[in-house]
Amino acid sequence: MMHRQASFIPAFFPEGVKAGQDYDFFYFPSYSTKDLGNPVLGGGTLFAITKDSKATREFLNYLGHPQSNEIWMAIDGSGFLNPNKLIDLSKHSSDTFRGLNQILLNATTFRFDGSDLMPGAIGAGSFWTGMVDYTSGKSAKEVADKIQASWDAIK
């Protein structure tokens, strides 16, 4: 069974399951007629300076260095993946996260998951259920109309 899920999903796995045997991770499959390379869909953390200072700039600069990221990577169950090609993958807390991060590092295309940027009523509500409805047989128009109605209701 294939299931698309985020890097936090191993936290929900039962004890004793083995990577590569009971579960695995892979790139999103391409069309049979078109090679999409290694596409990755994900989220990300953005930082913004609201009050400029030397200390703030130094801290943000530090966050861009592999060492700061490797600290997060080492925390068991953090789900922290990093696109910085200078990181040491051995710093990850598990083989699972090393493998997940390798997928990210080898991506040829990265796209932000739009639902992460939507208001909760849409991203975790009508958009989510709409995608399930679409894969269960409802028409694209019917699903899109329902999602649009949700947007209209929160304006």
PLM features: what roles do these ranges have?
Residues 44, 58, 128-129:
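Positions in alpha-helical segments
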Residues 133-145:
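Short, charged, surface-exposed loops that flank catalytic or proteolytic processing sites
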Residues 1-52:
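Extracytoplasmic/periplasmic substrate-binding proteins
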